[in-house]
């Protein structure tokens, strides 16, 4: 992901370039575009536009352009990495109230995805590095490359079933 400047207002944006030589990259691009097409919520990262073109060598090039989140990911706040030789580091600590507000923001985004979209969406990759923080430390869930649509009929059939599968460090 790169930081860029867009338009006459010099708006900061995040540019997610997909490396199409990696297995599943095109599928991830399509999934993210489909998931983000019709969803709008204050706690979801806003996609501004997409780019699908050829690069200078004639290879396919795809990128997603997002609203820039100046405070980075929740991961960088929970597990800061200090630079070599940096005595104090850029020590950023979230208070209990800030952490609670971030949890509420993420829960609100998930509630929207699961219960208020035309077809419910399951994120499938929720982890601190995919939770981005704006200027006011409001959380925005991003990276919908693994998202799955759940047809309404399927959700009704599985009301009494639950599953918990995850990776260490994921939410």
Description of each model-found segment:
Residues 1-171:
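Conserved eukaryotic protein kinase-like
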């Amino acid at each position: 992901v790169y930081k860029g400047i867009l338009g006459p207002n010099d708006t900061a944006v995040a540019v997610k370039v997909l490396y199409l030589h990696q297995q599943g990259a095109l599928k991830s691009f399509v999934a993210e575009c489909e998931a983000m097409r019709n969803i709008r919520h204050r706690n979801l990262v806003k996609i501004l536009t997409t780019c699908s073109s050829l690069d200078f060598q004639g290879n396919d090039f795809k990128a997603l352009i997002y609203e820039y989140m100046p405070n980075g990911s929740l991961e960088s706040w929970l597990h800061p990495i200090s630079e070599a030789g940096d005595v104090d580091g850029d020590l950023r600590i979230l208070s209990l109230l800030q952490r609670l507000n971030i949890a509420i923001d993420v829960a609100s985004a998930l509630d929207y995805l699961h219960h208020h979209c035309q077809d419910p969406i399951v994120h499938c990759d929720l982890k601190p590095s995919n939770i981005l923080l704006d200027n006011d430390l409001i959380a925005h869930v991003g990276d919908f490359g693994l998202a799955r649509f759940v047809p309404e009929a399927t959700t009704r059939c599985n009301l009494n079933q639950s599953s918990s599968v995850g990776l260490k460090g994921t939410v």
